[in-house]
Each structure stands twice: as structure tokens, then as C-alpha cells.
């Protein structure tokens, strides 16, 4: 096995850079020698992953947060084709949310992820694909391992990316605070959507998501019935809802008891298409 470790030192508001000497030592004990690459800016992980695969790496270990893991994943795939089908992707979560590993039953401590790598068996999982219109009006493609969402969640991510609260709050509290802060300025939005090959319908939604994994937003148990390898995505659309009712029901999403709420549209899908005359944040 030829291993390349790709680190985002900025993950977790710079926490990963401080932890790296300890993570590096633990990784060497767990998986043996490896090559190291560090990202400097957004998008670097995609390019570094592709170069590592071209140079013969058969295992890539992403060290950082969920966003970094997603970038590394996107380095594995180009035009819907895996660059090296024999290569595997592993991770050590040291970012803000650390949500994807929860779907695999790994607790939040990075030491546990490193320990899992020692005798890890390769598991095949599904990957979702998003085609979207970027802010510059160009068409983009992004692959995802965990959850793709739009609406309030996109606004929350934008808030966190531009906030220094991550220096003071842990992942769960940071996402909770950002959600409460953002929801006051984020309205229900009108979208037109189609599920699989069904008819086009319309809905007012504050938040919609397609889930491969079960958790997002710093431990929100958003999709308790999602499976990583069932060939399906769990669609959840939060219908038109008042601000007061949204805040009242918010604790349920941490427990995974929200699916039966009348304000939630839930079903298993293979394909979902949505469009809006409004700007909707992914």
C-alpha cells in the first residue's frame, strides 16, 4: 500500500495544524510510512489528490474537517469516472463538524479514527452527484459522500465560514448558534422540483437536503434512515413553517425524531431536480 496523507492545517479554525505532530506520530504507528501534502487554499485538496493517484498512491488519508474530506473525494472522480478504482479513501477528522464519521460509528476523537485505520477493511459506499449553477452563472459538478443541502443550511455554512466563533465554541454549539442566528434572516423559499422521473411540483421550503450519510450541522441527526450503500438518497424537505415552530422543533433534529412531523416531506430517491427564481444557497 502506497499512502499519501493530505492535511488541511486550517481545519477546525487552525486546530489541525496544532494537532498535526501528534496525529502524524500516531499515524506512523498505525499505518506505517506515508507521504505528506498540505493544502494552502480552497481547492488544493482536489488537485493534490489527483496528483497522488497519478503518482501511484493506493490509499489517500484526509486529515481535516468534512469540507476537506469532500474535496479529497472530488479528487478521486472526474467526469463520473474513478481515477483509480483500486485506491481507497480514509480520514482522520479534526475539523469543526466531524459529521461523516458519525455515520460510520466512529466517535469524535481523532485518536479513534487513527486506531480504526490500523486494521481497517475497505468498504464500498455510494457517492452523490450535484450539478448546480455557481454564483458566476457557470455550471459546476460536485460529488458528495455525506449530505448535500440547500436553503438555510447553506446560509449557516456561509455564516460559520465568516465567523471567528469557532475559536470559542465546539462544533455542535457553533452550528446550533449559527442556525439560530441565521434562521431569523433566512425566509422560506419557493422552488420547483422533480423527484426521479415524476411530475414537476412546487413547494415553499426553508431547508432541503439529500442524504447519503445520517449527520450534518455538527451532530444533527438529520437522516436517521439513510444508508451509505443502499443506492438511494434520503430526501428531506422542510415545508413552509413559521419561525416559532421551527425553533420549537429544532431539538428533534438532534434526536432524529423529526421525520414524522407534518412539516417534513421525506422519501427515498435516486434523482432530485430543483430550480428557483430566487437565489438559493447550497
Regions found by a protein language model. Name each.
Residues 30, 77-206:
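Catalytic core of DAGKc-family lipid kinases
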